[in-house]
């Protein structure tokens, strides 16, 4: 597989920098050649500062084979256009990168529809801006161009696509509600696994259900909810697992920081499995730095709040505790304010 050499531009914060690298490397053929950092990525012309943009342009000219610049923040069409014109290679922002990752991961019809919806939401605000940019660059409006008429047609077409996709997703939502009602009638309890991407959700899911779902350090390995049964029977020495009635375990889409609202909305029908669960296990990787855990914990709680999740159903679970000293567990619980006994986090 031919590698695509990219330059990452991100913030000089360790957590954000590491997450940015993870995102880029989640695209199978991407190779990070260099990382540039800057405190502010919201400058008017390029997103990044003019001096930093010129520094990157010089680096690209001196380094053969670089094909893309990834800016770890939201960029407007104008900023992307300006950067591409200056540097001479493709520029993508954080949201475009996440959408690209989604496309490489989607396997179910519903997941693909959700990604298409998110992409339309990403593109619609940019259409008229792109038209203005092309007009300013003296591209001929009209047939084959991006004149006002062409833009209006494209905009209406995207709105029709959006309506069609929402209708299909609503059909899937209704089917899910019927399934949920059937579960309630036969008294099937539902336990939902949520948390930051790569927190160990799928590992725990496989352990509890005897499944063999793919486990990967890459982000967004899971894009669709998977539900399997789990039966618990106790004795004094151990807990045995059997497929059967009693409890259903649900593995969900992994969370990530700075996920735009429209992307959360696109996956809302899938994430609703978390809302209707009888118990929600919020997983945190205890082998990470406590400060990173704190940030991820807050990010997860914010997303769950957006989904109107009942916090009384929520229990925080520390994973990978075999990799750390037991004393650190108490420090994590104290610093993150975890108090599962009172059902508050």
Feature annotation, model-predicted:
Residues 17-25, 57-61, 74-88, 234-237, ...:
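Conserved C-terminal guanine-recognition region of P-loop GTPase G domains, centered on the G4
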């Amino acid at each position: 597989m031919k590698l695509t050499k990219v330059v990452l531009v991100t913030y000089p914060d360790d957590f954000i920098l590491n997450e940015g690298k993870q995102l880029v490397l989640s695209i199978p053929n991407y190779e990070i050649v260099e990382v540039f950092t800057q405190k502010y990525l919201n400058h008017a012309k390029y997103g990044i500062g003019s001096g930093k943009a010129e520094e990157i342009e010089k680096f690209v000219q001196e380094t053969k084979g670089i094909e893309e610049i990834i800016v770890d923040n939201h960029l407007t069409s104008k900023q992307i256009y300006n950067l591409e014109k200056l540097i001479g290679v493709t520029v993508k922002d954080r949201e475009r990168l996440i959408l690209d990752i989604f496309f490489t991961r989607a396997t179910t019809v519903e997941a693909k529809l959700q990604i298409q919806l998110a992409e339309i939401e990403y593109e619609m605000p940019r259409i008229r801006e792109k038209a203005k940019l092309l007009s300013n660059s003296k591209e001929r409006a009209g047939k084959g161009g991006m004149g006002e008429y062409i833009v209006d047609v494209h905009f209406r077409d995207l709105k029709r696509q959006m309506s069609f996709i929402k209708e299909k997703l609503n059909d899937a939502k209704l089917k899910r509600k019927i399934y949920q009602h059937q579960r309630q009638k036969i008294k099937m309890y539902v336990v939902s696994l949520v948390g930051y991407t790569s927190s160990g959700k799928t590992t725990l899911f496989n352990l509890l259900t005897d499944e063999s779902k793919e486990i990967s350090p890459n982000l967004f390995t899971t894009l669709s909810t998977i539900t399997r049964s789990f039966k618990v029977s106790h004795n004094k020495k151990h807990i045995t697992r059997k497929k059967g009635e009693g409890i259903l375990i649900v593995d969900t889409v992994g969370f990530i920081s700075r996920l735009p609202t429209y992307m959360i909305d696109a996956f809302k029908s899938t994430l609703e499995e978390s809302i209707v669960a009888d118990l929600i296990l919020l997983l945190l990787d205890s082998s990470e730095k406590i400060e990173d855990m704190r940030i991820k914990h807050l990010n997860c709680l914010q997303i769950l709040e957006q989904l109107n999740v009942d916090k009384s159903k929520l229990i925080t679970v520390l994973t990978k505790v075999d990799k750390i000293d037991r004393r650190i567990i108490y420090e994590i619980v104290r610093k993150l304010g975890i108090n599962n006994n009172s059902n508050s986090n």
